[in-house]
Amino acid sequence: MKVVAFERSVQGTGASRRLRNSGKTPGIIYGGAAEPKMIELDHNALWHALKKEAFHSSILDLEVAGKSEKALLRAFQMHPFKPLVLHVDFQRVSATEKIHVKVPLHFMNQETAPGVKLGHGIVSHILNDLEVSCLPADLPEFIEVDLAAAELNQTIHLSDLKLPKGVTAITHGDENPAIASITLPAGAQSSEAAEGGEETPAA
């Protein structure tokens, strides 16, 4: 995904306010051997890009003054109540150095999972993204969580996922975190329990 930016020479609160008033968003690109560089981007283009899932978890081609650099979106600041992007941070990436990125999880076959279709359970997403370590070339846009065989009262863990080649999960101490589960809604009972129940004779 290509992102066009321009070098920014003037800094400070007043300069940033003037930029925003002219339809631009201030930002920075840092990392690697090069010095941090102040940049500005078209606000509307950035606003629409931020709505795309891939913009948050893909290697971007960031073009500044005609020169393209590989980068990741690292942070962005929104106005507390206006639809306005106040600032954005990008980090340079090297093809030979591993990166740590949160990758979105895509839950597949939720409606046809036995625990949902037959057991009348609901799927709860315990995690919606997974932090991974990999080389930039191996970074996936998303990771699939296949629920095709998931039963009622089953919990899907990290060990149940098939991670792409070259991709390692970062779990921060929990070696096999829960990803999703299928349970009955509150107050409901399983079909087996309903069929097995017997009426109590009147006294």
From Swiss-Prot:
Query: Which Gene Ontology molecular-function terms are recorded?
Result: 5S rRNA binding; structural constituent of ribosome
Q: What is this protein's function?
A: This is one of the proteins that binds to the 5S RNA in the ribosome where it forms part of the central protuberance.
State the species of origin: Cupriavidus metallidurans (strain ATCC 43123 / DSM 2839 / NBRC 102507 / CH34)
- One GO term (biological process): translation
Q: Which InterPro entries match?
A: Rbsml_bL25/Gln-tRNA_synth_N (IPR020056), Ribosomal_bL25/Gln-tRNA_synth (IPR011035), Ribosomal_bL25_b-dom (IPR020057), Ribosomal_bL25_C (IPR037121), Ribosomal_bL25_long (IPR001021), Ribosomal_bL25_short (IPR020055), Ribosomal_L25_dom (IPR029751), Ribosomal_uL5_bac-type (IPR020930)
Q: Which gene encodes it?
A: rplY
The name of this protein is Large ribosomal subunit protein bL25
- One family from Pfam that matches here is Ribosomal_TL5_C
The record's Gene Ontology cellular component field reads: cytosolic large ribosomal subunit
NCBIfam families noted in UniProt: bL25_bact_ctc (TIGR00731), PRK05618.1-2 (NF004128), PRK05618.1-5 (NF004130), PRK05943.1 (NF004612)
Summary of subunit composition and partner proteins:
Part of the 50S ribosomal subunit; part of the 5S rRNA/L5/L18/L25 subcomplex. Contacts the 5S rRNA. Binds to the 5S rRNA independently of L5 and L18.
**Would you say which domain of life the source belongs to?**
Bacteria
Keywords linked to the UniProt accession: Ribonucleoprotein, Ribosomal protein, RNA-binding, rRNA-binding
Q: Which family does it belong to?
A: Belongs to the bacterial ribosomal protein bL25 family. CTC subfamily.
